[in-house]
Amino acid sequence: MNPESALSAADKAEEEKKPKPFIIAHISDIHAGSQYFVPNLMDRAVIELNELKPNVVIVTGDLTDQGFKQEYLLAKSYLDKIDCENLLVVPGNHDARNVGYVHFEEMFGSRQSILHRNGLSIVGVDSSEPDLDYGTVGRHRYKWVKEQFTQKADFRVFILHHHLLPVPGTGRERNMVYDAGDILEVLQQCQVNMILSGHKHVPYAWRLENIFAVNAGTVCTLRLRGKVRPCYNVIEIGEDECTIWRKYPFHDADLIIKFCPSTVAFEKSPATESPTQG
């Protein structure tokens, strides 16, 4: 064996020893049934997710456009094609229209989500209100959220549909939950590392104290603000490092942000998209 081959084999063996990152695919705002829904974008996203083989797929709401049963059935038909044993889904404001939350519960179960796996804790809540666009977590849920995060974990994730922080280009009103400040304080006390949300179709990332808030765009509709494109997030959680990518169906990915959970040092990509930047 020549030295180069030996070195390559040694490097390969060393690489195989390293623990693989825990991968989360984060999609949002499918809006099945909308006139702006693009089936081939959702088809492609499903194919890409199955090729990615994530450990968890998270869907942060607005599966439907008006909360109708046929829209839920359409959304579910796509989500059922995703080959991942851990699928966490929370409803959005569109899903709560026309008493749509009853169909959500019939097809997806509880409107709250919990997963404790591989040192990771993920807790999701329903922030929607029936027939209203604004959202709230609600004081009655704070104790429950705290209880779910008491389990020992290396990395904690909170998921909901609405924003807890403003996102550029999303305008006023309805983008943040009414009790954003209170729930942020709860999450800070729980030592949550990351918040995942959707709602206004603008992908973005913020750091607030020790928490990183990451918003997803719409994965498969043309309800787009400015120059934003359909996309979803891919999150890689490794040894004291978290890297978040924005993936465009049929196209490449852009780095959004990379951070160290223990020091909260971070590097934000210039490619972070806003409605005024293409």
Give the ranges of each region predicted by the language model.
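N-terminal active-site segment of His-dependent metallophosphoesterases
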Residues: 1-78
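Extended active-site neighborhood of metal-dependent phosphoesterases/phosphodiesterases
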Residues: 3-11, 15-16, 69-147, 182-188, ...
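Beta-strand-turn-beta hairpins that frame and shape the catalytic cleft
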Residues: 15-25, 114-124, 150-155, 207-212
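Active-site neighborhood of phospho(di)ester-bond hydrolases with catalytic His/Asp-centered motifs
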Residues: 26-28, 56-62, 87-93, 126, ...
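Short acidic, glycine-rich surface-loop motifs adjacent to enzyme active sites
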Residues: 152-169
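Conserved beta-sheet core of the metallophosphoesterase superfamily
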Residues: 172-243
